[in-house]
Amino acid sequence: MAAGGNRDGEKRGSRSQADSGFLGLRPTSVDPALRRRRRGPRNKKRGWRRLAEEPLGLEVDQFLEDVRLQERTTGGLLAEAPNEKLFFVDTGFKRKEPRKKRTLVQKKSQRLQKPLRVDLALENHSKIPAPKDILAHQVPNAKKLRRKEELWEKLAKQGELPRDVRKAQARLLSPPTPKAKPGPQDIIERPFYDLWNPDNPLDTPLIGQDAFFLEQTKKKGVRRPQRLHIKPSQVPAVEVIPAGASYNPTFEDHQALLREAHEVELQREKEAEKLERQLALPTSEQAATQESVFREMCEGLLEESDGEDEHEAGRAGQPEAGDGTTEISPTGAAGPEKRMEKKTEQQRRREKAARKLRVQQAALRAARLQHQELFRLRGIKAQVARRLAELARRREQRRIRRLAEADKPRRLGRLKYQAPDIDVQLSSELSGSLRTLKPEGHILRDRFKSFQKRNMIEPRERAKFKRKYKVKLVEKRAYREIQL
């Protein structure tokens, strides 16, 4: 048994030595023939997957990848390469010849002959030639074109040239006259007109036609409103930043800008503290109790009830003071209803005379007052002058207020305009070079805020997405109980 086992081992060892002729470039490259492969079912996908995941399958993949790498880099396997390709004979140190100094022109020409790095990166460094595409070298209608070339060669010998060659020769003999290119003066002198001008030349054919017809057929231009000729704000489109925002500002300008930014932050903190103070929860000492809530609810009710009690007590004591019979006035509501008696002629004459006398007295009083107004003419003039001066003062105040608010953004929507933060850098962040300067702000955000400040668009906020619930279909019970 032992001898047989040794014989089998010698056969296996000799087979391994015969198969191991592979030289790998990587230190992990191992000849797969040195390992004994495990047997397993290969007629199912499970066996294929297991074979690929086993160490032997991984080594086979690594072996094939190493073979491809050698073919790409050296043009073949290292085991098959001759000794002259792998080794060289060292004959000793070679003495370098002194290099001649090159002129600037020679250096420049050599630099121009040297290929660029981008071209070297795009070159094919693989030793394996690319597969030849036969279709790329095929020419459609090659036989037809070859016959046509033979025909034209035969005609050229007879002195007849193709049509395109004859046209080219004719163009050379009689070249076309070059067209004059329009210069800058021609472009400036080109007629132009104002689109909103009332003397528009395009409206000349429409003069004398029916205005209603032109309006209905959309041939009449839209009249530009006068308000569109006025700018909504006098703020310049591009504002010059303060001197302290420069990349190399003076000490005074930078400190002034820092002070301005500091005041803005202080104002913002005050508003935040005020809001927090208003929304703060009360302490245990300030918390409302049941007694304080009841006292607040009864506030004002107890005083009114006390006054009513005193008033009722006074009314109740009045009949006790006079024990006699109380006389009720004839006009009182508690007395018997009085019958309306017919007026006599004498009473009617007296009432008519009294009315006439009152009218005469009112007319005399108005005439007397009008006569007295003549003596108050100087006072009236002074009063009118004071009123006119007051109106002029108010008018001037409104004009000054409008001028002061001309540069301020108006409220165009439900949101107020919020000024952007001041772009400022601390003293430690300043740099004397534009290359190392830390960027501040954003050009798109700056333009958007400029539109809002100049009253061209309203202040906006980010749209809030509303949650949409899934539609749920419910069948009513009365409908569900109906069975057909």
Swiss-Prot record:
Record region (Mediates interaction with CDKN2A/isoform tumor suppressor ARF): 148-437
Compositional bias annotation for Basic and acidic residues: 336-348
Coiled-coil boundaries: none
Phosphoserine sites (modified residues): S29, S305
Compositionally biased intervals (Basic residues): 35-49
Locations listed in the record: Nucleus, Nucleolus; Nucleus, Nucleoplasm
InterPro entries, per database record: Nop53/GLTSCR2 (IPR011687)
Family: Belongs to the NOP53 family.
Assembly and interaction partners: Homooligomer. Interacts with PTEN; regulates PTEN phosphorylation and increases its stability. Interacts with RPL11; retains RPL11 into the nucleolus. Interacts with CDKN2A/isoform tumor suppressor ARF; the interaction is direct and promotes ARF nucleoplasmic relocalization and ubiquitin-mediated proteasomal degradation. Interacts with NPM1; the interaction is direct and competitive with MYC. Interacts with NF2 (via FERM domain); the interaction is direct.
Region of interest: Nucleolar localization signal: 353-401, 402-484
Top-level lineage group: Eukaryota
Example GO molecular function: 5S rRNA binding
Protein name per Swiss-Prot or TrEMBL: Ribosome biogenesis protein NOP53
Knockout consequences: Knockout embryos are not able to form viable blastocysts. Transgenic mice lacking the expression of Nop53 in the thymus display a dramatic reduction of the number of thymic cells and of the size of the thymus.
